């Protein structure tokens, strides 16, 4: 304090208190300002004692001078204070701060001999010679530059700043001041001084790495440089990691192309510091709002504290102060602030708002409210006889207009007080039409229905109310059970408040008052002195006139004028009128009027007003993915023509409210460009939203496919309309708009680019389809409920309406839909409105009784590319839905393999023939028909050449649609398997389009199908069907028998191949002593096995037994293929067709064929009989009791598979049907599938562990959510379960099951019924469980007991699959293995990041480092190179590996201790 007290003494201190802070202000300097300035000097490494003299102040000003233009408010205040102290020391008389600054400027300018002003905006990085100031780089007299290290005072000031402010807003300008002119070496020295705050330092490092990478990408390395030439800096050079101080100085001050590496590096650090400031000060300036009762001064303090953390230009901060400070104030203060006029000073705002919210203001408000309440209400139309009182819109006072007002002009709208529009365009001044009573906060956004009195307020009594708009909402109310009328809530959904509530009770939720649309006259029925009259509600008429009624002789003659001229009327007063369930007494005239009208005198008495509800669709909140930021991509160059086109498009969109100008604080940008539309006359604007799509949250497509005309029910009338600018009618959430910013550049950079952001859904953004689909579903939902007899098909912006109504009624419902859409802000362009057939819709042409494809045009090319073929195939696939016989197999083969889109394609003869055949098919026009629910749906399948299939789905003789199938999933296949795939495709397609399965006509005999299906059934969904007699086109070609053929020769085959030389051998031996070997070249193991099998077929008789050890060969043969892409398999097929009977079996790797010993000694029939005869009988008893499978018998009794298979096959209850073909399912250890099945009138709930096949099942009393939840809880208490997959039955989707799953931590997923990829495992297990129950049913009385017995058999008596284990063994083994893996990983992770230095024997030198494998109590195990050593703990030093930067001794390990400087 001594130095601070000695700064100014006596007379100087008195003079200080006479100097004003501002020229026009009243506040003056005090000694507290000197104390504050002394504290601030320490941040810049300057001594407080410098303030005691004129020369010291001059030194301070020299340091602060270059920082003023970009400094904070604190820095500028410090500079001003030092200027005042300098003037006092120089005995210069000044009145205020501004005079002091000007005086200091003149004196210091004269001393330095320059005209440089004090607060200069820019200065060179290195000063001229002789003016070194505080710069680390200084110029010598010879013109060279030398480096002066940073002083300890500067580093200390930096560290103290970080410690005091904890990365507050002051850190960034402080860093700018202290690092002025520094090299990267000096900046790194400053960063290294910060010991704590390592999280912030890591953020800065990541920013440096990112910026360095961007620098390297934008500045590629040039070619070889001449000798002696200085290289250009890389990103790591700028960061100071790969460059020296001398190189940095040369880059900064070289004459040719200098690179300011210091300033660049400072900018990188500033970006990192700004990110840290935002992290440590998370409050956004936009979120700082004044509380309802918060004093204005406290709000201003919070505002400016947050404003300091915003690192933006001074102009932007000034804009924030002028707009946000007032905009975010509470309503009371905002009202006061707007009365201060344009751009009030902060002092004026603080003074004006000083008493706002206090008792005084509340008393004034209450007095005004009481005064208004005591004022009698005006008599209707009495004001028309008096002079109207003029009220000023600007100041609110009476007696003058806004033009004559002398008060400061209010900023923004004079109606609502908001900026951005004038009062004439204020949305709050808009009105809806004829609303009964006063409005709430939100106007109803949809047309209303009939009034509560029963009269249709929207139509004349003679017209049917069934077609009125009110029907939409009447039906919606009945569906929801509501009693009131539908209104639009703020969140965009529809609610139905109770009709019984009064207007005053509804408050801000809006009123369900009578509403009249303007597409026809608002005519109602009124009762005038009990006489019913139809009258027109006319807000443009002053008086009310009716004709044709008698109201007595007490009248006054009157002549009134109107559009048709003057008419004579009789004016009668005090007439009772009942209209819209309200009674009033008013004056009415009778006379010869062309139409009865109620004018404003009656409408006012009824409380009606003219309103225009502004339809608002609430935007859906959208966010970025966690941890992601918006796109910051530069705009690429565009041609002048495209720039002008984009400017015109953007100006039009801005006028229509679809775009708005982006503020200067928006840091995001996405490139934009333009392309010509199809007509080549207009341009289309495109935005490259790929980066924004990558960081935006994920969405779910609500509409998963395109509607098909064959699925439409047959209707008499069809209308198609289009929603114009569909995406641009849906608002984008305000918080997300900033990320859609884009820039329109100018030619030659003649002006700054104009930046826009989207206010609506942008084209090309991934969220637009999902949000649009969701919004349209909500908008159309009440219309669908109100018109259940009308078909409404909506796909994106195309809408189809079909009905059996009369022409007038159909047109009326279409008009209602258009009005509904128009009322919500959607446009329905007349040019795309289609009423008369043919109607163009989704690529189809529609008539009331049939549909066609729009005209197809196959491309004609001289030279075909891959892209051309793709387009051609796409057109043909589109045509295949109605043109039968379309083929594309050979066309697709033209582009098979890896080819570029522009690569030229060479046509084959087959492809040319296929194309010509398709052209002939397309030349004959085809028609499709609509679906009739009462008729049966049929599907007929036909096989074409080359395994291409055609099918048609029809009702009687009328074809709904056709299709083709040519996808061959296996290299070796047969017609029956392909037929099953075709049936499956048709079944899925029919479920999607019609919701039902057709009756199939299959070109196969029942016996052929059942023979293949019994031996090759699949765990996939195949719909049920009835066989219809058709010409059999599909048949199996060779006879595989299930049992060995007695008396036939038995062949044992094998093949092998050397992987390096690709040489192999195929061989066989027989039980009769024959053998054969064939040497193969350039082959594989699988090909050698097939060659051996083919040799066997060639050399064997008409009946043969073949034993193979290859599952590959076995799988091909038992699939009974009819054709294949493999030469050797086609040869096998041809040879097997010639055989009378073939028995094929598989045994695992009989080594005798491999050359070790003769195969006939290993697998001869005699050995099999002698070795296992005594074990066959116990195996048969075991099977009769438990019905164990073949693998279990083989494992438990050691009998051969052939014997075990025979035991199972001879059992009447266990007829084998082959092995299942399993698809790919999630087989993690915690995944279970659950389903309910029915047997003997009981409900059985089944749960299957997917990976092991372990089953849990029991009988439950009812298929409810509670019983399912109890079973799930019981299951989870026994076994680990993390994922449960079920179908979407009501019991599985119930709240009880969801609550149990949430409590246990189970992830739930649901599949679609009949989908083969959904719950195939549990569906198959239901089948197995029922079969097992049928085998042992007689062993128990109740179904509850037999279910548990069957579960025991399936879990413990059924062996096979992976590891040849039972499901119970497999599940326990999986759980044990998982625990062991976790234990080992946990142990290994303890040693993963440690290295060991060690000593061996008497050698005192430390060796290593080695990798730590294990740490025991007395020794450690170390891996050194390929050797593993055991080292005593006392001779080992364990060190954590920190990537070569830091080391920790073993004291950081648990149980470590130090002895004599060594780690034990």
UniProtKB/Swiss-Prot annotation:
Binding site for Mg(2+) 1: 722, 797-798
MF-aspect GO terms: aspartic-type endopeptidase activity; DNA binding; DNA-directed DNA polymerase activity; exoribonuclease H activity; lipid binding; RNA stem-loop binding; RNA-directed DNA polymerase activity; RNA-DNA hybrid ribonuclease activity
Cofactor binding, per record: Binds 2 magnesium ions for reverse transcriptase polymerase activity. Binds 2 magnesium ions for ribonuclease H (RNase H) activity. Substrate-binding is a precondition for magnesium binding.
Protein biosynthesis listed as a keyword: no
Motif (Tryptophan repeat motif): 1009-1025
Ranges annotated as Integrase-type zinc finger: 1174-1215
EC number(s) reported in the record: 3.4.23.47, 2.7.7.49, 2.7.7.7, 3.1.26.13
InterPro entries assigned: Aspartic_peptidase_AS, DNA/RNA_pol_sf, Gag_p24_C, Integrase-like_N, Integrase_C_dom_sf_retrovir, Integrase_C_retrovir, Integrase_cat-core, Integrase_Zn-bd_dom_N
Boundaries of every Peptidase A2 domain copy: 533-602
Region of interest: Dimerization/Multimerization of capsid protein p24: 280-366
Active site: 538
Domain Reverse transcriptase: start-end pairs: 656-846
Regulation: Protease: The viral protease is inhibited by many synthetic protease inhibitors (PIs), such as amprenavir, atazanavir, indinavir, loprinavir, nelfinavir, ritonavir and saquinavir. Use of protease inhibitors in tritherapy regimens permit more ambitious therapeutic strategies. Reverse transcriptase/ribonuclease H: RT can be inhibited either by nucleoside RT inhibitors (NRTIs) or by non nucleoside RT inhibitors (NNRTIs).
Residue span of motif Nuclear localization signal: 26-32
Residues covered by region (RT 'primer grip'): 839-847
Cofactor: Mg(2+)
Region of interest (Interaction with Gp41), ranges: 7-31
DNA-binding span(s): 1394-1441
Compositionally skewed regions (Low complexity) per UniProt: 459-468
Superkingdom, natural source: Viruses
Positions contributing to Zn(2+) binding: 1183, 1187, 1211, 1214
Annotated spans, Dimerization of protease: 514-518, 562-568, 601-613
Residue span(s) of domain Integrase catalytic: 1224-1375
GO biological process, any: DNA recombination
Name by which UniProt lists this protein: Gag-Pol polyprotein
Protein's organism: Human immunodeficiency virus type 2 subtype A (isolate Ghana-1)
Gene name of the record: gag-pol
